[in-house]
């Protein structure tokens, strides 16, 4: 066989191998698209970023958190619930109360209070906090959005009745197009949700975060477990690689008799990291920084990021009619790496 022929055959073979690799890669990408997990940091061949899990594992009560910025929102925000960040937008969930719920003397029909009336909002802002769109969510008695999570493509939002042991709708909002898709309905009040990028499943927490549930994307419940932690009620959570969930929230505790007793409350704030495989609380720490209106900073919307050993926390504890209105507060801290 001539040298020129051999070279042509080798070139042709290499081209076929290259084309096969491209086709295989395209097929894999299309499969990712069908499963709804494209674009996530936990998919593909990239190693997930574990900075946040590693850093939070050394956060203590003595971690020196410093407030570094305060972003005032100049539109009606009502009662804020959850926050999430995409590349281009800030998303803030909130409930507008039209008629408050009223407790029954004794439970009626399985409920401890009236449903009340309200409007669920998902505010879409640019990174400067300017309102770009107000998305209304909910149906009938289900008008109360909760904690939200951004999975790299979509923002997941639960909208529940404003009472325990009720029902909720799980929404998916495309972060780029802002298209809204009603994913499924569930029994019970679910006031928070995260997307587990390792499994492609959703995990939600009920009223007071007393119970967690895991679903597939069609709403089939795959597992449920009780929360072993009683320090705080989780208000807003986020997925953390690998297979963890970071939550923050608040518990209202009675004051001392001299300070008003049960008629007054002390807001205990805090954060907790939960293992989504073992369901154990890996680490929980209190957080006692205060807003303009005097609320603990982790009262409602909360998200955290890490870069190396540097942590950044975003919170929005005040309602639109409190203090200086809703402000997104930024706290930052450096932590020592684990030994």
What are these regions (language model features)?
Residues 66-73, 130-138, 179-185, 220-227, ...:
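A short beta-strand motif characteristic of beta-propeller blades
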Residues 39-69, 91-135:
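Beta-propeller domains
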Residues 87-89, 152-153, 198-200, 242-244, ...:
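Short coil/turn segments that connect the beta-strands within blades of beta-propeller domains
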Residues 77-82, 140-149, 186-198, 230-239, ...:
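Repeated scaffold domains used in trafficking and secretory/extracellular systems
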Residues 1-32:
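Secretory targeting and sorting signals
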Residues 230-283:
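Loop/turn-rich, solvent-exposed surfaces of beta-rich toroidal or solenoidal domains
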Residues 125-130, 173-178, 216-220, 275-279:
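Short loop/turn segments that connect beta-strands within beta-propeller blades
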Residues 42, 92-117, 160-164, 250-268, ...:
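Short, conserved, GDST-rich strand-edge loop motifs in beta-rich repeat architectures
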